[in-house]
Each structure stands twice: as C-alpha cells, then as structure tokens.
C-alpha cells in the first residue's frame, strides 16, 4: 500500500460495528480488515478467537515505537486510529458462517500480514425427539442463519459405538437406516442426483423401504410443512437402547458451530391384547398386537400354552397362531414372548377355557298339544342353553337348565318346532350346538258357525285355539237321505257347494297337522229353500187372491210367510203364515199399490235367501156420482163429488159435446175438507150441454166412470161492433134502429135503449138505474128510455135475436119502471143499446134493472142527432118534468135505503149509491177496539167497508188495454190497467209495443215504489223482461204458483239451468234456495245491445192458497221483511215488481201490508181503508177478496199487539226470514170476491 493512501479519518457510525480499541481504525471491504502498526518491526503470530458474530484477533510485533495502526477499506475509504502498543482487536457485528480475510499492516515498515477466518454458524435450536419406537426415532430442529448443512453424531451409550451423518441440508426431511456392522465409527452422507440444467436436485423419496440399506436419503418437505424445520428419521435402531444425538451446524466451508444434543431411548418389544378366537373343544386361534416397527431384523414369538395335565409350545413370526391338541372344558394359561434377535421383550398373557363337547343323543321324549319333552347326554358340561323356534319363524325364546332333560311348555297345538341345544363351559364358553325337531298335537276345532247359507252352498267358519300353520281340516257333510260330501280345507273356513235346497246336513270337521289327526266336532244345518216363483195376484177393491209355486224336491215340508207392504212408505199392512201355496188377503184399501213378499221357510226356521215378490194394486174405488155447478160469467163448470174411499192418483175427466170430445187427466183435485173433490172445467162454450164422465185412477188402473150431463152458464153478450142508428122524428122524439146481439154467450133475454146528452163514453151497468125522471131532474145525462123483453116478443111475435129492431123514443110508453118520455126540443141525443143474457129487476125500486146482477153488454154510442125547436108551450112542460123527476127520486131513494138496511142484516154486501170516503185513519192505540167492533157479527163492519170500495176507480179509462192488438196481451179480460198509471215500455217497431198489463203502484215513500203486473203469458215473456230492464228492477215478488188446481196461473218466465234469451235480454240463474214457504232465486240480467248487466232476486212465495190468504199473518209479515232487507242493498229508485196471476188480489195485499207497516212505524196510525182505496185508483180490483181485506186488518192487529208485548224485535225485525216458519203448511181459505178471482 502506498503512503499517500495512509491517511487518518473518523470512522463512520455504522450500526453493528464496534471496536474494542479506540485508537484502532477498522476498514471493511469485502470482508477485509487492514490494521497498521509502527515500523520497523514486522507483525507475527496472529491468532483469532471466533464466534458467530465476532472475531478476536491477537498478534505479536517488535515495533515498540509504533504510533498508529491503520485499517484500510480500499473500496470506500481509509480510516486511521492512533494506537500505541495494541496487539489485539475484537471485531463484532459479523454474519454467522461467513469467511473474512483480515490484514494487519505495519505503518513503520509497510509490511502486511493476512489472516482468513470464517465465523461460526449459529447452533441449532428447538432440538427435540418427536417420536420414539422400538427401532425408530424422529428428531426435528429449527434452522440457523448462515448454516449450509448439518452433521449429526449418533452414539449408542451402552456400546459407545457411533455413527457420523453429514450433508444434512436445512429445511429437508431425511431418513437414515442404522448399519448392521459392529463398527464403532462410521460416516455417511446424503446421496444426490447428477446436477441438471437448473442445478442440483435432491432425490424425491416416497417409499424409504425401497432404498439400499445404510443409505441416507434427503427429500423436500411436503407442502404445508414449516420450511424452517429440518427432520430426520432414524431407523433400524436397537430396541430398549439409549442413544445420544448431537447436531452440528456447518458453514459452507465446513466450519462447525456449537453442538446441540438430545438423549433418547428406544422402546422394548412388547406383546399386548392377546385374544382367543374360534374356540372349540380341542383348538383355538390366538391373535395379539406387537409394537415392533422395524424392518431389517425379524421378530419371533414363542407361545407357551399350559393347562390341565399338559402344555403346548409354539413359535411363529406373525401375530397370530392356531393352537391344536387341547382338551375340552379346560382352563389354559397362555403366554406370548417376543424376541428380537436374542433380546426378549415384554410378553403378553391370556387365560381362557376351551369349549365343552357337543351333547349326544338329543331327542324328543314326549309330546302333547301344549308341551314337548327333550333329553340328551353330556360328559363335560353342567349348563345348557336351549333355543326354541317355530317352523318358518325366528328363535323367539330360549331356556337354560343344568339337567340333561327339559320340558318345553306353552307351545301352540298342531305346530312344528325346531330345538337347538348348546352346552356351556364353566366361564360360559359355548360348545357346538345340536338340533332336533318336534310337533305338538293338533287341537279340536271349536265354534263351528254357518256364516252364509244359500240353497246349494254353505259357508262355514270355525275357531282353533292356536295360530299354528299347516292345519288341514277334513269335512264330512251327510244328509238324512244318506248322501255324503267330503272335502278338505287348509283355512278355518270353507264354502261347500252342490248341496240340495231345504235339506238338513250333519257337518263334521276333523283337524290334522303333519298327518296327525285331532278330535272331531260337528253341527247340523239346513240349506235354504228356494224362493217362490210365478206369483199371481187377482184383486178387487179390498182383497187380493195370491198364489205361487215352489219347485224344490223338499217343498212338501215348506211353510210360507206372506208379508203385504204398502209400496212407497214400506209400512207393514199384514203378515200371514201358511203351508199352502196360495192365500186370500182381505181388508185392503182401494187404489193402493202393495208389495207382496213371500219367504219360504223350512225346519228350524231357515228361510229363502230373498223373498219372492210382486207388485199389485187394488182396484180404485169408483166415483159414485157428481154434480155440476155453473161458474158465473165464465164458460166453465165446477164439478163436485165425494172423495172415493182409498187412494187415487187422479181422475180421468171426459167432456163431450155434439162437436167436441176431450179426455183430461186430473193429477188430483181440490178438496175443502178431505171429503169432497172439486175441479173446474174451463174453456167451454157458454150455454152448452156436455156429457161429462169421471173415473178414478190409481196404479194405472181406472174404475168404472160416473156420468152426468151438465150445461154451462151464460155471461155478458159479446159487445157488438156497430152502434145503433138514430134519426130525428119530431122536436121531441127520435127513432132508434139496431140489430140483435150475438147469442154465443147465451140467449138474449132483453134489450134496453139508452139515450145520453153527454159525452159518448162507453156506458157501464151503472146507467141502468137511471130513468127518464132522473134525466129530467138533472141527476144524470144518461137514462134508459125503453126495455124490450125477448121472452114475451118471442112467444107472441116469433122474434129472435138476429132480427133488426126499430124503437120509437119519446112516445110516452112505460116498460116496467122505465118511462119513454118525450125528448127535449133543440136537444142533442146519442143512443146505445144494452143486450141482456140475464136480466134482474129490483122490485123494491119500481122494477128497475139491477145492473150488478144482470149480464149485460153495451153497443157503442151512435152519432149525435139534434132535435128541432118545440112549437108548443115549453115552460109548462119543463115544470111538470122537473116536479115528476123530484118525486121519482124521493121514492127511489127511500126504496134504496130500505134495501140497504135489509142487505146489511143478511150479510149480503151490495152496491151503494153513497159516495165512499177516501180514508179512515185510526190511531194505533184505538185500533184493537176498532177491530173488535168491525169483526163483530161475522166481520159485518169490514164487509161494509169493502163493499164501499167495490167501484173505486172502475170508471178510469183503459183505452190502451182495449186496443185490438193489445187484447191478446191480457191474461184476463176484466183486469186491464188504467191508462193514467200504466207502465209504458219503449216503442220498437209498432205503436202498441209500449203496452204491458202493469201499473205503477204507490208505496209509502214514492208513487212508483211498486209495479203491479199480471203473471206473464207465453206471448208476453219478452215484454216482461224488457220491463225489468227498462224500469231498472232489482227485485221480483211472485205470489202464485205457476199451476194451481190444474190451471195455469203464470208462465214460468225464468230459466232454470242454462241462460236464456228473451229478445235483447239474457237471463241466467246463479243460485236457488228452496224453503217450505218460499223460494229465493238469484239471476243476472244482461242487455245484449250494450253488454250492461245487473243482479236480480226473485222472492217466490209459494204458501199463499189459491183464492185465499196465508195461514198465519206472521208468515207474510216476515216475508215482507225479507224483501225489505234485500231492498236496502239496491238503488232506492228501483221499484219492486210484484205479481200473482191477475196481479190484483195477492199483489194488492202484499203492497198494502208493506205500506201499513211503514205507517205504523212512522206515524203511529193505521188506514187500511185509505191504502186500499189509493191502490184501486191505480189498478182495478187491488185486494180482490173480502178475506184479503180482513187479513190486512188482522196483520195490523198482530203487529200492534207484538209491539205492546215488546216482541217486535223477535218477530218482525232483523229476522233471518229464510229459517222462520219453515214447517208450516198452508191451509186453503175461501171468501167472498169482488171481481175476478185470481
């Protein structure tokens, strides 16, 4: 080194680098340390003390004058520290296992002395033995920095032999097998592959046993193992030997660090878990476990078996052995010694008995139905286990005994068993089993029963006291005639066929199992006799002669039970017993369907399986006679006859005339008191004789008919089409010409000529009471001026109703009470003619015509005729006329008053000329007293009130209903809607399309609360549904049945199953609830033109008798509340459509009761009269009969009484009406009528 390079400077502060001597300057460059001393003496004898991170240098020199020591780092800079007489230097902070070159330079002589030193690697840490076996041990340690490899020294502490293993790489798994030589020292190194292009690769070993013995194998650690650990497995060690393992860490040049050691001892060989298997009387198999884990040295096992009087020795090299030549039921002590070479390990021990010998002569000694005895022989066993198994089953129980015999009890009779016996040694060791089979004796059958018997078959069942299988039952059936039938069954039942009907058999059953037969048992049983056939019945009205046949061979001993039942209800009429094949049954009911059932019986009461039977009917009782009643003003006859005795399904009604013949079946007839039948024959001709026959029908039979000749009544003559001709004769007379009326409704009895000075309105019967005197005094502008009686003229002049008549009016003639007075000059007169088929005179009123009781029709009025001026004195004539008229009026009023008084006493209500009141308002608290007053004397007061209502509204015009095109739309020609209140439909193609027989009716809240209409006709169904749609109807109240008393009262206008179209309206029923008193139906009504629809509910009251009233008031009241509850859900402007047949009687009663309930609840008053009056001003004949009028008052009384009793909520409000009074049956009631009966 040049002097220029030797300069002194302060050393840098570098962590980890310390100087032991402050005057010394240390310079590091790639492991070099330069240290300079003073010249002239050179440096010699350099020594070093090395550790993993430091080097202590010491040296000698002879330069006592050295003033400094310099250490140079030629790569960086030179550092110089003044030193004086220093001969050592401690260098720290070095890296373990690293080679360094140190140079010491003398400053004086510039001479250099170099020294290369490698620091020690760190010693291993965490050295421990992870597992130790008999010949193996596994050691692991943690790697140290700077370690390139490890060397292991293993010493056997007993023999002091050792093995040196080098080349162990950090982080690897190694395996080393100890050599078998007796060398005290051996060295081994890791084997490696030839380096490839990527460097040296260790041998990957997966099966260490495949490597050559004594080789050291190193493999890469498995994935997941800590790479900082190194492991070595030492194999082929000596058992039960102590070893010392010392680990040296080595630098790359072989420099070793401080050693670390671990002393361990291998386990000795040991036998454990010695077991004996497959133990028999003379042998057994032994198994055990060994802890030997080596592979180089073979281990052997020496077995010593000692017991009884001899022992057995055996040597094997595996952990099992078969020991033979042993004695039965002997206790043996077994020892298993392990030997590894000459070294004996820890032995294993076992003490075990051999099995006893198999028993001999195992046999069945005795047998019964419930037990089997067993016996056997054995020489070396004192305990035995017996297993008992039923054939086909599993071992279900076992028994133990110390004897050499055993009785097995509680067995099943007739059952095969399998017995197995096993001897047991003193410790319970089992010997070989022995088996024997045995069967119990079968038991006799019990409870033999005949479960089914027919004419030729017998089904038998019996019981057995056990459930044993394999039974065979032998059956023998023997009859009295000696015939024998044999058969077998494997079940406890059998069906035996080919038997003889009605025969007694002796049945015997023998049980058998495994060809062992048990005790027999027997019963006797008859087969059933055959049913009778060819049943013939001859009947009268009350008897039946019955005969039959039975073709069985044993039929001579048969008896017969004859049962007569009513067909339908099955009630027993009579039961008879006979031994003959015929019988006469008396005291039957005529016209009744009977069932005769004949059971054949034999011996002990065994009967035929099914009876022979036949249906028959007694002859119906004939109708003895009947009488005819004429229906006033109807082309009909009412027929009445005594109800025949017995039952009948109807009657065949024959009606014959000269040109007409009709047979009608009456399903039934109306009976007032169950003693008299009645029916109405309609659609006949007036005033015609008919040959009528009535025959009783029942069960398809018809009795002899009863016959009679009946003549129909008469009615008002047909209204003539033309009007009379009137011409002026003088200033006070005219001439009236007319043709006779048609006589199809009865012979014309009289004609009345009527004059009027008023409007040409259609006259009514009311005008017949007015005379010339009434006209003259101004009481009426219409009067009867002349009367022609056909009977008289017919006798004297031979005139008939087809002739033309000419009457002089004003000739001052008198006919009965009518004066043909002179006419007024300058007057305008019109004439009409009244024709009579029946004319009645009021003898108490000057012989005037009684229009109410006469059958009359009127021609239209003629055109007006004007009279000329009277040339005479007019004033006197006028005065005389007026005076005369007053006198006549007074007399007529007196006569009428007298008649009125008489009629009231006789309860005959007649027409009153007094103008009736419009209202009779009564307070609720006074109504009961009023009701009692009116009810007195057979409802006389109510009759007078009802009579006052008779003609209310009848004069109101009905022109639209009388148009020819509309007449066919009316069900009855006397129930026509008033023009003022009629319901008008939309006009479609014709001006009369707006007509339907219906009126708006006032309710409590509105004048159009209701629509009252007739029951639809087949030709008005479309109009009816058009009205429902156009008038926005949501509820229909129907108060009639479609057919009553055999007459159609209303067409069934609704669909029942599928939707139906009525013009543009489609109707579909969605539900129907049928109850005893009414039926509720729901519909959907849809207009096909605009596809709009709304719901509709029909309340069909079916308990209102024809021509009567409901049986109880609360029935109708609750029905009304049912309707009103529904109306709360629909639009308030929607009217309720109410109809019966004509739409006046029952319809008016329902509407009236609705208004009365509202009046009672809201006003605390009652006005039955006023409400009916109001209804009749909107539609004729509303509340049609007097009984209906009285019924309304009764309803009011019941409501008021219920309110007083605080029961209104219970009876009339919030009622689930569909469940009330469901079991009441309506009773027909008849009463007086006012107008047409609907």
From Swiss-Prot:
Q: Which residues lie on this side of the membrane: Extracellular?
A: 29-876
Supply the CDD domains for this chain: FN3, R-PTPc-J
Positions that bind substrate: 1106, 1140-1146, 1184
Q: Does the keyword Endoplasmic reticulum apply?
A: no
- Protein species of origin: Mus musculus
Start and end of every Tyrosine-protein phosphatase domain? 942-1199
Say what the protein does: Tyrosine phosphatase which dephosphorylates or contributes to the dephosphorylation of CTNND1, FLT3, PDGFRB, MET, KDR, LYN, SRC, MAPK1, MAPK3, EGFR, TJP1, OCLN, PIK3R1 and PIK3R2. Plays a role in cell adhesion, migration, proliferation and differentiation. Has a role in megakaryocytes and platelet formation. Involved in vascular development. May be involved in the mechanism of contact inhibition of cell growth. Regulator of macrophage adhesion and spreading. Positively affects cell-matrix adhesion. Positive regulator of platelet activation and thrombosis.
Tell me which positions the record assigns to the signal sequence.
Answer: 1-28
| Topological relation to the membrane, as annotated | Single-pass type I membrane protein
Bilayer-crossing regions? 877-897
Reaction(s) this enzyme catalyzes, per UniProt: O-phospho-L-tyrosyl-[protein] + H2O = L-tyrosyl-[protein] + phosphate
> Carries keyword ATP-binding?
no
Catalytic center at which residues?
1140
Name this protein carries in UniProt: Receptor-type tyrosine-protein phosphatase eta
Cell compartment(s), UniProt? Cell membrane; Cell projection, Ruffle membrane; Cell junction
């Amino acid at each position: 080194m040049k002097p220029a390079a030797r300069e002194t400077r302060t050393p840098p502060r570098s962590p980890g680098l310390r100087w032991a001597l402050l005057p010394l300057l240390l310079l590091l460059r790639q492991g070099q340390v330069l240290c300079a001393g003073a010249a002239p003496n050179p440096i010699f004898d350099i020594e070093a003390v090395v550790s993993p991170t430091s080097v202590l240098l010491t040296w000698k020199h002879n330069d006592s004058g050295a003033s400094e020591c310099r250490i140079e780092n030629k790569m960086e800079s030179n550092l110089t520290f003044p030193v004086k007489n220093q001969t050592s230097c401690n260098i720290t902070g070095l890296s373990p296992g690293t080679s360094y070159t140190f140079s010491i330079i003398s400053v004086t002589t510039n001479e250099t002395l170099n020294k290369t030193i490698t620091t020690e690697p760190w010693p291993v840490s965490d050295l421990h033995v992870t597992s130790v076996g008999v010949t193996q041990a596994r050691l692991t340690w943690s790697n140290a920095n700077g370690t390139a490899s490890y060397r292991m020294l293993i010493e056997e502490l007993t023999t002091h032999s050792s093995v040196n293993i080098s080349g162990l790489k950090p982080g690897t798994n190694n395996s080393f097998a100890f050599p078998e030589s007796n060398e005290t020292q051996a060295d081994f190194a890791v084997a490696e592959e030839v380096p490839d292009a990527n460097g040296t690769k260790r041998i990957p070993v997966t099966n260490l046993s495949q490597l050559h013995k004594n080789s050291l194998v190193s493999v890469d650690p498995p994935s997941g193992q800590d790479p900082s650990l190194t492991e070595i497995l030492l194999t082929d060690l000596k058992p039960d030997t102590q070893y010392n393992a010392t680990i040296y860490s080595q630098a790359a040049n072989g420099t070793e660090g401080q050693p670390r050691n671990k002393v361990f001892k291998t386990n000795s060989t040991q036998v454990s878990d010695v077991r004996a298997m497959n133990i028999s009387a003379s042998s057994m198999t032994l198994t055990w476990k060994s802890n030997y884990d080596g592979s180089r040295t073979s281990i052997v096992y020496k077995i010593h078996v000692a017991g009884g009087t001899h022992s057995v020795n055996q040597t094997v090299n595996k952990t099992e052995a078969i020991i033979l030549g042993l004695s039965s039921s002997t206790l043996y002590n077994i020892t298993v010694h392990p030997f590894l070479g000459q070294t004996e390990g820890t032995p294993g021990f076992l003490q075990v008995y051999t099995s006893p010998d198999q028993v001999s002569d195992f046999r069945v000694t005795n047998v019964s139905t419930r037990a089997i005895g067993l016996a056997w022989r054995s020489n070396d066993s004192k305990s035995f286990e017996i297993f008992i198994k039923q054939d086909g089953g599993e071992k279900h129980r076992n028994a133990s005994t110390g004897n050499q015999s055993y009785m097995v009890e509680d067995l099943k009779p007739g059952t095969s068993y399998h017995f197995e016996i096993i001897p047991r040694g003193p410790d319970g060791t089992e010997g070989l089993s022995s088996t024997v089979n045995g069967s119990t004796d079968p038991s006799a059958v019990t409870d033999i029963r005949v479960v089914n018997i027919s004419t030729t078959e017998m089904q038998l069942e019996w019981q057995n006291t056990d459930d044993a299988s394999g039974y065979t039952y032998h059956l023998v059936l023997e009859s009295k005639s000696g015939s024998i039938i044999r058969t077998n069954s494997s079940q406890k039942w059998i069906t035996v066929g080919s038997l003889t009907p009605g025969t007694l058999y002796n049945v015997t059953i023998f049980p058998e199992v495994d060809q062992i037969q048990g005790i027999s048992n027997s019963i006797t049983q008859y087969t059933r006799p055959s049913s009778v056939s060819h049943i013939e019945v001859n009947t009268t009205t009350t008897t039946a002669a019955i005969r039959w046949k039975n073709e069985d061979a044993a039929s001579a001993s048969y008896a017969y039970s004859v049962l007569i039942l009513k067909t339908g209800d099955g009630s027993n009429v009579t039961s008879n017993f006979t031994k003959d094949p015929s019988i006469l049954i008396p005291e039957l009911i005529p016209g009744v369907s009977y069932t005769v059932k004949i059971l054949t019986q034999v011996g002990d009461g065994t009967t035929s399986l099914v009876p022979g039977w036949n249906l028959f009917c007694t002859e119906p009782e004939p109708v003895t006679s009947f009488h005819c009643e004429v229906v006033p003003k109807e082309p009909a006859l009412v027929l009445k006859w005594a109800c025949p005795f017995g039952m009948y399904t109807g009657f065949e009604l024959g009606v014959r005339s000269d040109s007409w013949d009709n047979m009608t079946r009456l399903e039934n007839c109306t009976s007032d008191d169950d003693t008299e039948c009645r029916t109405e024959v309609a659609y006949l001709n007036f005033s015609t004789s008919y040959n009528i026959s009535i025959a009783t029908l029942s069960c398809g039979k018809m009795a002899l008919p009863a016959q009679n000749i009946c003549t129909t009544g008469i009615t008002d003559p047909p209204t003539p089409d033309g009007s009379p001709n009137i011409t002026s004769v003088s200033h006070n007379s005219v001439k009236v010409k007319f043709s006779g009326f048609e006589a199809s409704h009865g012979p014309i009895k009289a004609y009345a000529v009527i004059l009027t000075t008023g409007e040409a309105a259609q006259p009514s019967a009311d005008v017949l009471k007015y005379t010339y005197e009434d006209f003259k005094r101004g009481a009426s502008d219409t009067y009867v001026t002349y009367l022609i009686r056909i009977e008289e003229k017919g006798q004297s002049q031979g005139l008939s109703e087809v002739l033309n008549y000419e009457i002089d009016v004003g000739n001052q003639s008198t006919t009965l009470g009518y004066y043909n007075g002179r006419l007024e000059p300058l007057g305008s007169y019109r004439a009409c003619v009244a024709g009579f088929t029946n004319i009645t005179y009021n003898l108490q009123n000057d012989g005037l015509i009684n229009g109410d009781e006469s059958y009359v029709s009127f021609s239209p009025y003629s055109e007006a005729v004007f009279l000329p001026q009277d040339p005479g004195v007019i004033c006197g004539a006028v005065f005389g006329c007026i005076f005369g008229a007053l006198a006549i009026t007074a007399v007529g009023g007196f006569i009428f008053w007298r008649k009125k008084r008489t009629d009231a006493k006789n309860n005959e209500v007649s027409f009153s000329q007094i103008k009736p009141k419009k209202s009779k308002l009564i307070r609720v608290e006074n109504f009961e007293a009023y009701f009692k007053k009116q009810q007195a004397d057979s409802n006389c007061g109510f009759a007078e009130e009802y009579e006052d209502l008779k003609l209310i509204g009848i004069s109101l015009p009905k022109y639209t209903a009388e148009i020819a095109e509309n007449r066919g739309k009316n069900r009855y020609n006397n129930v026509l809607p008033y023009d003022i209140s009629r319901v008008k439909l939309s006009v479609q193609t014709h001006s009369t399309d707006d007509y339907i027989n219906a009126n708006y009716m006032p309710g409590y809240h509105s004048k159009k609360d209701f629509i009252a209409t007739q029951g639809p006709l087949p030709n008005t169904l479309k109009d009816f549904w058009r009205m429902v749609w156009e008038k926005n109807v949501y509820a229909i109240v129907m108060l009639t049945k479609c057919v009553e008393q055999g007459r159609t009262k209303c067409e069934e206008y609704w669909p029942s199953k599928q939707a139906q179209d009525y013009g543009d309206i489609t109707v579909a029923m969605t539900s129907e609830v049928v109850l005893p008193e009414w039926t509720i139906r729901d519909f959907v009504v849809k207009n096909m033109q605009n596809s709009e629809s709304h719901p509709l509910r029909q309340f069909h009251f079916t308990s209102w008798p024809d021509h009567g009233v409901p049986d109880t008031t609360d029935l109708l009241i609750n029905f009304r509340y049912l309707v009103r509850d529904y109306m709360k859900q629909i639009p308030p402007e929607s009217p309720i459509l109410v109809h019966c047949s004509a739409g006046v009687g029952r319809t008016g009663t329902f509407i009236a009761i609705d208004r009365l309930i509202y009046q009672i609840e809201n006003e605390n008053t009652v006005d039955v009269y006023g409400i009916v009056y109001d209804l009749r001003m909107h539609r004729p004949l509303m509340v049609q009969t007097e009984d209906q009028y009285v019924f309304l008052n009764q309803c009011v009384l019941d409501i008021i009484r219920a309110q007083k009793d605080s029961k209104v909520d219970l009876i009339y409000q919030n009622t689930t009406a569909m469940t009330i009074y469901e079991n009441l049956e309506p009773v027909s009631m008849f009463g007086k009528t006012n107008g047409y009966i609907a």
